[in-house]
UniProtKB/Swiss-Prot annotation:
Function: One of several proteins that assist in the late maturation steps of the functional core of the 30S ribosomal subunit. Associates with free 30S ribosomal subunits (but not with 30S subunits that are part of 70S ribosomes or polysomes). Required for efficient processing of 16S rRNA. May interact with the 5'-terminal helix region of 16S rRNA.
One GO molecular-function entry: ribosomal small subunit binding
Basic and acidic residues bias locations: 122-132
Name of the protein described by the UniProt record: Ribosome-binding factor A
Residues covered by region (Disordered): 122-145
Entry superkingdom: Bacteria
Residues in coiled coil: none
Biological source species: Methylorubrum populi (strain ATCC BAA-705 / NCIMB 13946 / BJ001)
Record GO biological process: maturation of SSU-rRNA
SUPFAM superfamilies: Ribosome-binding factor A, RbfA
Assembly and oligomerization: Monomer. Binds 30S ribosomal subunits, but not 50S ribosomal subunits or 70S ribosomes.
């Protein structure tokens, strides 16, 4: 009997539901439906949501605009997890309302780190000393004459 292979990434259904949950969370946070002083004083972005294969768990990656005060914002979201779950269930038609988990979005930090690495002296020196493809292509074109 052949074993069922698991795909390497999320299924199309997981991605579609994750996007619906992301939109629902962003709408609730934007409208200010949750009465909390921390959430009221911060604009919170939800750049990504990842769903579990059974669609019962949604991990939302959040970041306050400006990237400051992440811990209080995530704590406030955790406090209001039940209300947020109810709002997501109202907006997204699923058999089960997914349990919500909130994590800090680190993609901006990672992008800044990679940008800093690319601008470092070592990388610049390597780029200057490496032969370019244009230089290698010139002798071939000269031999055709």
């Amino acid at each position: 009997m052949a074993q069922k292979q698991t795909p390497s990434g999320p299924s199309q259904r997981q991605q579609r539901v994750a996007e619906l949950v992301r939109h629902a969370l962003a709408e609730v946070l934007q409208r200010g439906d949750i009465q909390d002083p921390v959430l009221g004083s911060h604009v919170v972005t939800v750049p990504e949501v990842r769903m579990s294969p059974d669609l019962k768990l949604a991990t939302a990656y959040v970041m306050p605009l400006g990237g400051q005060d992440e811990a209080p914002v995530i704590a406030a979201l955790e406090r209001h997890k039940k209300i947020l779950r109810q709002e997501v269930a109202r907006r997204v038609n699923l058999k089960y309302a997914p349990e919500l988990r909130f994590r800090r979005d680190e993609t901006f930090d990672e992008a800044a780190r990679i940008d800093q690495l690319l601008r470092s002296e070592k990388v610049q020196r390597d780029l200057e000393s490496a032969p370019r493809e244009d230089d290698e292509a010139e002798p071939d074109s000269a031999s055709r004459d």
